[in-house]
């Protein structure tokens, strides 16, 4: 059994966000991190590896520097990594990205026992579309909002979170599960041995030439020009006013608050 974990290197949006003239993010100007929801997918895959001895393959689409992220995941416990990288793939929207990743997984092989884990959504786009689109392209069942995954005989038992609770779902393999951050799923750190060994583990690079003949990919709908989604406008919202911390006793703070509200004609 193999688990493909689809991960994405995203800009750290907690800092200043820069936008290119074409509406895409200026990723080079921002620090890169592993997408938070993807960290949960990594941890749940590694937990299953601990329990079943399965193989875990980290897979990403991105520029060559994304190799460093894959090495980090290997240092956490993944067995190997796959980097999908080509200029022709740059600027792909979710529809194009899901095609490319599906084609890569199809080329690598998806057996009847295999699974694909994705983070629910990426913080740079927040669409939550790529995971479900991969499942549709590969014609396999999918479960979203997974917060707990167990192998149960020939089935997979998934704890799917809801707004007011959760539901338990049994799904056959091969399947795709999108994972969310949950207090019960705490991503592990890289180990010292893992760091020392991660550069000796295999990392496969798939470029345009490797994937262009795959049946799941339509060459006229990939990349920035081929993507059917057009960004009409992208911008950084203006900074809001700075908050004010009131000091003193409770009585003094209440009086100060009333004064400030009266100055602004709120009361």
UniProtKB/Swiss-Prot annotation:
The keyword Transmembrane helix does not apply. It is found in: Cytoplasm. One of its GO terms (molecular function) is electron transfer activity. The keyword Repressor does not apply. Gene3D superfamilies: HUPs. Part of the ETF-acryloyl-CoA reductase complex involved in the pathway of L-alanine fermentation. The electron transfer flavoprotein (ETF) serves as a specific electron acceptor for acryloyl-CoA reductase. PANTHER family: ELECTRON TRANSFER FLAVOPROTEIN BETA-SUBUNIT (PTHR21294), PROTEIN FIXA (PTHR21294:SF17). Heterohexadecamer; tetramer of tetramers. Each tetramer is composed of 2 alpha (AcrC), a beta (AcrA) and a gamma (AcrB) subunit. Belongs to the ETF beta-subunit/FixA family. This is Acryloyl-CoA reductase electron transfer subunit gamma. It comes from Anaerotignum propionicum. The lineage of its organism: Bacteria, Bacillati, Bacillota, Clostridia, Lachnospirales.
